[in-house]
Swiss-Prot record:
This is Cell division topological specificity factor. Keywords: Cell cycle, Cell division. Belongs to the MinE family. The keyword Cell cycle applies. Prevents the cell division inhibition by proteins MinC and MinD at internal division sites while permitting inhibition at polar sites. This ensures cell division at the proper site by restricting the formation of a division septum at the midpoint of the long axis of the cell. Coiled coil: none annotated. GO terms for biological process: cell division; regulation of division septum assembly. The keyword Phosphoprotein does not apply.
Length: 84
């Protein structure tokens, strides 16, 4: 980070913010055992809001699921983007 970026408060990109949020969610879930994934609907709404800035999509165009098998967790996000 440069001094100017620090002083002027350069805004983070939405992708890096989303990545940080996902990392926090995953770390929280792993630390807390196998609690229910009650954050998935909120995550889906936020994804729709971010992607809608660039492409016209609806809430039904995104599917978010979390699968657990033993000590492995898979967060799956499926996004249907309409053809141009």
């Amino acid at each position: 980070m440069s001094i100017l970026s620090f002083l002027l408060g350069e805004k983070k990109k939405s992708a890096s913010v989303a990545k940080e949020r996902l990392q926090l969610i995953i770390a929280h879930e792993r630390a807390g055992g196998h609690a229910p994934a009650d954050y998935l609907p909120a995550l889906q709404r936020e994804l729709v809001a971010v992607i809608s800035k660039y492409v016209k999509i609806s809430h039904d165009d995104i599917r978010v699921s979390l699968e657990r098998q033993d000590d492995l967790e898979v967060l799956e996000v499926k996004i249907e983007i309409p053809q141009a």
